Amino acid sequence: MAPPAPADLGRVLAPDTVRFERLLPGPVERVWSYLVESDRRGLWLASGTLEPRVGGTVELTFHNARLSPEPVPERYRARSGPIASRQRVTRFEPPHALAFTWGSAAAPSEVLFELRPDGDRVRLTLTHIRLDRQARLDVSGGWHTHLAVLAAHLDGRDPPPFWSLLTTIEAAYGKTDQDRSDTCSAS
């Protein structure tokens, strides 16, 4: 697999913040449905219920092994799923903004998805905040890979081989982290 273009890499906005931007086929309401509907979200990230209100619960169940037919490499067995977490909605503005906590209840980070029309496409901006350095490194390759799977579904294409792409992306982020201070690496 070819390494990603530098423009596609997540950008570190602050030591605790990474941002990704993608242009996706629209309309906005269609992309929104892939954020809030369990079956559609499960195609690219994690299934589970989402209470559509600030303070509502988000149940996320990751089944990464189901995102493509590729066998799970040994090094990723622990990430293959199912992995369940319970989070809290922190922003809900259909169909333009969704945010929820991420990670442990003791020290959660937060993920914000923003959608806006951009010509005949939709600009998705994903911002992950309140990350310590290791967490930022850990989530960057995952977000990049999951967003590639989302883009494929929205484009009507088969998703890329999840584990091969994740391996390539993590290597690219690792090299970029050494070469440039405005992007982040993945573990």
Predicted regions span which residues?
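Short beta-edge strand/loop motif at the mouth of beta-sheet-based domains
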Residues: S38-P82, F162-E170
